[in-house]
Amino acid sequence: MGLFNNFKFKYTRAQLEIFRFSFCLLAPVAVMYYIGTDTDKKLNVPGFWPDPATLNQIPKEPYEIKAELARMKKERLEKRLRLEKKIQEEFGLDLEEEKEKIKRDLALKKG
């Protein structure tokens, strides 16, 4: 106890303000320095980014764009035909007949 009583050092208000200012100024700088050095080793997560070969490739050339549009139209047509077939099988509806009914109803509403 006597050892600590002999060592009485009190901080003045100016010293505390200087410490606070320097801490507030240097702490973010120290964190940024720590994070900024060797980021490949510290923050590297293997397998985080997907392999570029597995990503969708955006067509850039005109022939690639046309081929992609043709593929999309083909998929959409196949899906539509599949759904029409499913409707005909499950509900027994004739789609052409239903389309004609809708056209007649719309013509009656207009006229």
From Swiss-Prot:
One GO biological process term: mitochondrial cytochrome c oxidase assembly
Gene Ontology molecular function: unfolded protein binding
InterPro entries: Pet100 (IPR018625)
UniProt keyword annotations, A-Z: Membrane, Mitochondrion, Transit peptide, Transmembrane, Transmembrane helix
Cell compartment(s), UniProt: Mitochondrion membrane
One GO location term (cellular component): mitochondrial inner membrane
Topological relation to the membrane, as annotated: Single-pass membrane protein
Broad class of the protein's primary localization: mitochondrion
Transmembrane regions: 18-36
Anything else known: Present with 468 molecules/cell in log phase SD medium.
PANTHER family: PROTEIN PET100 HOMOLOG, MITOCHONDRIAL
Identification of the protein by name: Protein PET100, mitochondrial
Gene behind the chain: PET100
